Amino acid sequence: MPTAITSCPPKLDFDRISAISASTGLPLVLHGGSGLSDHDFREAVSRGICKVNIFTDIDKAGKRGIEKGLAAGAGTMMGLIPYEIQEMKAVVREKLTLFGSVNRA
């Protein structure tokens, strides 16, 4: 299962994000966030990041959901899906709050 696990902690150049945002006036995208702290995400958003592409955390949540479903006795894929979705939704809700995206279009 492919996941973006980093071998060393990432370090965002926040001043560069600010400069790019100021010079382009365009919404900026952060592709990936594996290894970033909540502070890093909040700072990046405050400096001009408008969209964050995340997969690894959601993927891991899906795996946890499947594991919970198996532990609860769900024996079919259809039985596991609700567990997977529940865990993934929780991570998405958490990220939406972290990124300041709740109740925003």
Residue ranges and their predicted role:
Residues P9-L30:
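Alpha-helix-loop-beta-strand connector modules within alpha/beta enzyme cores
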